[in-house]
From Swiss-Prot:
Name of the featured protein: Putrescine N-methyltransferase 1
GO molecular function, one term: putrescine N-methyltransferase activity
InterPro entries: PABS, PABS_CS, Putrescine_N-MeTfrase, SAM-dependent_MTases_sf, Spermi_synthase, Spermidine_synt_N, Spermidine_synt_N_sf
Binding site for S-adenosyl-L-methionine: 117, 192, 223-224, 311
Disruption phenotype: Accumulation of anatabine at the expense of nicotine. Plants suppressed for PMT1, PMT2, PMT3 and PMT4 exhibit strongly reduced nicotine levels but accumulate polyamines in roots, and have an impaired leaf maturation phenotype at harvest.
Catalytic activity: putrescine + S-adenosyl-L-methionine = N-methylputrescine + S-adenosyl-L-homocysteine + H(+)
Biological role stated in the UniProt entry: Involved in the biosynthesis of pyridine alkaloid natural products, leading mainly to the production of anabasine, anatabine, nicotine and nornicotine, effective deterrents against herbivores with antiparasitic and pesticide properties (neurotoxins); nornicotine serves as the precursor in the synthesis of the carcinogen compound N'-nitrosonornicotine (NNN). Methyltransferase that mediates the conversion of putrescine to N-methylputrescine. Promotes leaves ripening.
Family membership: Belongs to the class I-like SAM-binding methyltransferase superfamily. Putrescine methyltransferase family.
The gene coding this protein: PMT1
Gene Ontology CC annotation, any one: cytosol
Composition-biased stretches (Polar residues): 24-50, 57-77
Pathway connected to this protein: Alkaloid biosynthesis; nicotine biosynthesis
């Protein structure tokens, strides 16, 4: 494995798997419990008996914008980077107003703030380890496999013999794990903006991080949008954009200039698959993504969806596009991975969710979504 750091903003690249358990960076020291003048002034701002959380709790008000952990007795609500006690994690966001998703927390494994976002990992009672970024669930160890298998196998199952692939995001390693099922692949570049996410993988998901050492893999710590813009034209067979929601550090990955750079980096008939939100909540975002893609990609533009139990509304969507060149029929896989060799199965284990029938069904949309997407 080759590791390249492209961070230029003074961020710390942690070596040998070291992780700052309290989020201290850049030589600063901010005690979590910071007692001063008899008051309790926490990192999230408890002062004089009031709560002034990062996400807006003050004097008994509740304006949660991000995930929080609360105690079982319900009398105290603590910010995601302020509690190390078992309780309940609740996911709040302006992207899904009026609803929340909660998980029982067995143990808080890691909490910290990188140069880009709040990072938290905890052991849940039902889904194993859970990774959150800025309070939003990104992946669960025992419930996230539908998302990962589909974001990899929908595009790669639609082209014959993919050889050069780029992953944007995916610093934990689940996406890479699935990609290694394809024996034709010769080169995998992974661009992860947040080095803390990679360090969390090394410490808590060593079986995934071990794949970063595969000789076909180059791990780049840097900005995915900038990397694609600088990529050699026509180099990649496929690009997988395993991003978080279109806010914060991932916002640029949903804009037209990014898609233009992706199209340039793909070979004729190359494919891209990107996370594309939920049809139940984000049709306005989906329509904008589709409009951008239709202006850029001259092959085909498709929307697919699947079920993920720990994502808002229980579903997530994908944009699948191809560049002009050899025709790509995303709805009918030509390289079905569910017929993989016994050797691959013995090394990586069987697929848990994806199969050729699921692949085809992913493009069948409810009437309301189909009419809006096709309009």
């Amino acid at each position: 494995m080759e590791v390249i750091s492209t961070n230029t903003n003074g961020s710390t690249i942690f070596k040998n798997g070291a992780i700052p358990m309290n989020g201290h960076q850049n030589g600063t020291s901010e005690h979590l419990n910071g007692y001063q003048n008899g008051t309790s002034k926490h990192q999230n701002g408890h002062q004089n008996g009031t709560f002034e959380h990062r996400n807006g709790h003050q004097n008994g008000t509740s304006e949660q914008q991000n995930g929080t952990i609360s105690h079982d007795n319900g009398n105290e609500l603590l910010g995601s980077s302020d509690s190390i006690k078992p309780g309940w994690f609740s996911e709040f966001s302006a992207l899904w107003p009026g609803e929340a998703f909660s998980l029982k927390v067995e143990k808080l494994l890691f909490q910290g703030k990188s140069d880009y976002q709040d990072v938290m990992l905890f052991e849940s009672a039902t889904y194993g380890k859970v990774l959150t970024l800025d309070g939003a669930i990104q992946h669960t160890e025992n419930g996230g496999f539908p998302y990962t298998e589909m974001i990899v196998h929908l595009p790669l199952g639609s082209i014959p013999n993919p050889k050069k692939v780029l992953i944007i995001g995916g610093g934990i390693g689940f996406t890479l794990f699935e990609m290694l099922r394809y024996p034709s692949i010769e080169k995998i570049d992974i661009v992860e903006i947040d080095d803390v996410v990679v360090d969390v993988s090394r410490k808590f998901f060593p079986y995934l991080a071990a794949n970063f050492n595969d000789p076909r893999v180059t791990l780049v710590l840097g900005d995915g949008a900038a990397f694609v813009k600088a990529a050699q034209a026509g180099y990649y067979d496929a690009i997988i954009v395993d991003s978080s929601d279109p806010i914060g550090p991932a916002k640029d990955l949903f804009e037209r200039p990014f898609f233009e750079a992706v199209a340039k980096a793909l070979r004729p008939g190359g494919v891209v698959c990107t996370q594309a939100e939920s049809i139940w909540l984000h049709m306005h975002i989906i329509k904008q993504i589709i409009a951008n893609c239709r202006q850029v990609f001259k092959g085909s533009v498709n929307y697919a969806w699947t079920t993920v139990p720990t994502y808002p509304t229980g579903v997530i969507g994908y944009m699948l596009c191809s560049t002009e060149g050899p025709e790509v029929d995303f709805k009918n896989p030509v390289n079905p991975i569910d017929k993989e060799t016994t050797q691959v199965k013995s090394k990586l284990g069987p697929l848990k969710f994806y199969n050729s029938d699921i692949h085809k069904a992913a493009f069948i949309l409810p009437s309301f979504a189909r009419s809006m997407i096709e309009s």
